[in-house]
Structure formats: C-alpha cells, structure tokens
C-alpha cells in the first residue's frame, strides 16, 4: 500500500503523489512509454527511493520475514548478463578467455536448501540441462529461465520483472508467456510486470 507517496530526491519525482494498493492475489502490469515513470514507481515500491511524503506499508504474510529485501525480488531484463552476474556482458560470451573464468550455472545458483522447491523450479524452467553450462554461454531464453529460477529460489512474495520479453524471438516469448502463466499459480507469489510500449 502506498498513499500520497513522494520520493525525497527532487530529481526523480513523478508529477503527482502516488496512491495505490496491490491486493493479495493480484498480478499487475505497469505499462507505459519510456520515461513515463514506471521504473521510478517500482523503485518507490521496493524502497530504493525513500519517501519524503506519504506512507508505504507492506503485508508480506505469510512470510516469516517482514523486510522488502527478503520479500521483493526485482529482475531487469536487458541484452546483457548484468542481472545474472554484474561482471559479464552479452558481448563477452564470444571471448574465449572469459569463458574459461565464467562460472557454471550450478555454481551461481549455489546450494538450495528446499529440495521440493528446487525440483519444482528446475522442472518448470528445464534447468537440469543448463547446470553444467557456463553462464555466459546461455541463450537469451536460457538466461531468463536462470534469472527467474535464481530469484524464485529465495521464495519472494513479490517478483517484479522489468521488460521480460525484450530481446527474445517469438517462440521464446511464447515460452516465457506460458511460464509466467504457470508462475501465477505458485501459491502466495505476486507478479508485477513492467512493460514499455
């Protein structure tokens, strides 16, 4: 819930104070042209930009933790490997030296304590065949699946995806659309899509 929200930083304010509610069970799309304030709205909701005026409250129940950090995961999809690993860029996937130093998908995912969740996500996103692949050798579609799996393994209440369809060919977009549809049925997870027009 955000009521009368105005961020402190005067350089990144929206034209009007923000008041809106995301109700339990809702999945939301924030749609608009570039520069319309979509990312700023997300930054307000995640607490990246503290409010000067208004209030921002969360109800993450039934989560055991109450922090936005633990309960909100944000993935910005771009044609780079920035969200997967800040040290790798898309063009580096062709550099043989970088391939030697690049971690495997299994290494970046790390140890997963909840085996049932791991099995569910690995099946949903077909992760098993990727586990021994170097992260910089993943296709755009595989990278999306990896990023979603990595985020969902933390069991967030809210998953925000900024332009998840960017850079994907038509068959991969259709696959991602179907995966997102399946994600909407995962228990307490709320999905927020940020889409540029």
PLM regions and their residue ranges:
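Conserved ABC ATPase "signature" region
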Residues: 113-130
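ABC ATPase nucleotide-binding domain signature region
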Residues: 42-112
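Hydrophobic anchor residue at the start of the ABC signature
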Residues: 148, 176
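Catalytic Walker B motif of ABC-type/P-loop ATPase nucleotide-binding domains
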Residues: 159-163
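Conserved catalytic loops of ABC-family nucleotide-binding domains
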Residues: 179-194
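Helix N-cap at the start of a conserved alpha-helix in ABC-type nucleotide-binding domains
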Residues: 170-172
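Conserved ABC ATPase signature
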Residues: 134-138
